[in-house]
Amino acid sequence: MTLPVSDPAAWATAMNNLGMAPLGIAGQPILPDFDPALGMMTGIPPITPMMPGLGIVPPPIPPDMPVAKEIIHCKSCTLFPPNPNLPPPATRERPPGCKTVFVGGLPENGTEQIIVEVFEQCGEIIAIRKSKKNFCHIRFAEEYMVDKALYLSGYRIRLGSSTDKKDTGRLHVDFAQARDDLYEWECKQRMLAREERHRRRMEEERMRPPSPPPVVHYSDHECSIVAEKLKDDSKFSEAVQTLLTWIERGEVNRRSANHFYSMIQSANSHVRRLVNEKATHEKEMEEAKEKFKQALSGILIQFEQIVAVYHSASKQKAWDHFTKAQRKNISVWCKQAEEIRNIHNDELMGIRREEEMEMSDDEIEETTETKETEESALVSQAEALKEENDSLRWQLDAYRNEVELLKQEQGKAHREDDPNKEQQLKLLQQALQGMQQHLLKVQEEYKKKEAELDRIKDDNLQVEQLLENFHEKQENCGSRLCASSQEGEQPLEKTAVSNPVKSEREALLVGIISTFLHVHPFGASIEYICSYLNRLDNKASYQIPSKLTTSPLLPISTSDVESLMSRLQHTFRQEMTGVGASLEKRWKFCGFEGLKLT
């Protein structure tokens, strides 16, 4: 029975006879043109093993779109597609290397010839195992052919034009497990692993450095050739390796010793050349370092200029005219430029530190300031003691050497000279002991002088700090006294009560004593304070006029200082420390506490 492919009415009648709903729309061809030479619908593209997805027949279709399959005509049967609205048939998990499929739902009257006729379109069939219960197993030649066979799952098969139940069936195609497939797949995997190992081995052998050529055995002819190569700079490395191998093999003997010596001498002549080359390379390295440092300095200067531009743009005069986005970009750029500048600056400073470390101590010494007369005298004394100490140590070593020589001569001399040499030895030992004692005394004196020198340095530092504080206090007190002099005059009694400081001199004294007691938190006696003031007075050529005598200039007295400090109760406080004979009066600075009380 032959039906025109393009006649929709004829196909609708045939499908009604089978009890199936007609597919397609009236007035349109249900099936595309069929090419009998292909044995399949022309709408299906040709299948090749090189297609992606192991040669799956249908192209990728969106999951929400139903698959419309075509009717397939064979010589003895016809395959009708399933309803496209039904879900696709379920399949089991694909075994590795699967080439065998399970085909169920065959017609009862179906033969092996019909099965071959239907599935030979999917590919070459190796074997068919048919069962009596309407199913069979088909083994294909390649794995991609299994995917073609799965495409026929769900089709209705009809033998000829019969509508008998034994001549119809619904095909169910699924993956099947077969030991032959698994064995072939394992063999293939092992073959691929062998190929991969071989490829890696070849790659490793290719990357491996070539083995050195074998060294020839020693002979007079080869010795002359190596001697000539040793004189050539380009062939020196090869020749010296040969020479080293010969010496390690034990080729040196009496007959060949002169030849080997001449070759070693030739190798030694290259030392000066290598030293000159090293010096040349070092010079080039220094020049490259200098160029790099100069280039880095230029880059750093440009970075500084860029950062300065950003900072000037960030000032309010120009900043207010930029938009918000422009300000954000300028801030980000400025931050990035500062980070890069800091990195370059650290690198440049590291180079400079390395250069400074290479310099000798004499080049990095700086000239110190001139010391005071007492300090310079102590330094000169310490240097003199050090020189004397060194000279005594050298004399001591000389005496020890003489003693050793005398001991050696004493064993060789005759016995008749023994009394004289023993006496001389005793004298030398006594002189040695005296020198050792003198050396110990000099060392102790040297240590004392050094300790005294350190103490004087510390005192000088403290005095300099106090002088600075004194000048600051003097300026502050002078400004305050000028401001107070502009106020109206008040009675003498009220002035004495409200202002305990009577003159500018006393104000300066108060400032100096406050500074002194501030650095002595545990207080100081009145004698200690006056001695400090007198010493400071001698240093600064400054004296306080006494209000009790008619002499204009007198040294600072204890009573004046104590009366001044007694009037300032919120600034100075007197405390008693100790018990019994160790009882002592100490003055402390309490100016900050007085601020809270006032």
Swiss-Prot record:
Keywords, comma-separated and alphabetical: Biological rhythms, Cell membrane, Coiled coil, Copper, Electron transport, Glycoprotein, Growth regulation, Membrane, NAD, Oxidoreductase, Secreted, Transport
Which GO annotations describe the biological process of this protein? electron transport chain; ultradian rhythm
Give the EC number(s) under which this enzyme is classified: 1.-.-.-
Please state what class of enzyme this protein is.
Answer: oxidoreductase
Which compartment or compartments is the protein found in?
Cell membrane; Secreted, Extracellular space
Q: Activity regulation per the record?
A: Inhibited by the antitumor sulfonylurea LY181984, the vabilloid capsaicin, and retinoids.
Coiled coil stretches, renumbered:
264-299, 352-476
- RRM domain segment(s): 99-178
Q: Does the keyword tRNA processing apply?
A: no
Named cofactor requirement(s): Cu cation
Q: Name one Pfam family in it.
A: ENOX1
Post-translational modification comment from the UniProt entry? Glycosylated.
The record's section on SUPFAM superfamilies has: RNA-binding domain, RBD
Question: Which Gene Ontology terms cover its molecular function?
Answer: oxidoreductase activity; RNA binding
Q: Which PROSITE patterns match?
A: RRM (PS50102)
Q: Might you report a single GO cellular component term?
A: extracellular region
What the protein does comes down to: May be involved in cell growth. Probably acts as a terminal oxidase of plasma electron transport from cytosolic NAD(P)H via hydroquinones to acceptors at the cell surface. Hydroquinone oxidase activity alternates with a protein disulfide-thiol interchange/oxidoreductase activity which may control physical membrane displacements associated with vesicle budding or cell enlargement. The activities oscillate with a period length of 22 minutes and play a role in control of the ultradian cellular biological clock.
Family to which the UniProt record says this protein belongs: Belongs to the ENOX family.
Q: What is this protein called?
A: Ecto-NOX disulfide-thiol exchanger 2
